[in-house]
């Protein structure tokens, strides 16, 4: 459902921000 999608999006967003911070 949408909740699962939002959870995945949040996880992906965190990873994305982490990549930006590390570069």
Curated annotation (Swiss-Prot):
The keyword Hydrolase does not apply. This is Magainin-R1. It is found in: Secreted. Keywords: Amphibian defense peptide, Antimicrobial, Secreted. Belongs to the gastrin/cholecystokinin family. Magainin subfamily. Expressed by the skin glands. The keyword Endoplasmic reticulum does not apply. One of its GO terms (biological process) is defense response. GO terms for cellular component: extracellular region. It comes from Xenopus ruwenzoriensis. Antimicrobial peptide.
């Amino acid at each position: 459902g949408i909740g699962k999608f939002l959870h995945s999006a949040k996880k992906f967003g965190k990873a994305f921000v982490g990549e930006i911070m590390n570069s």
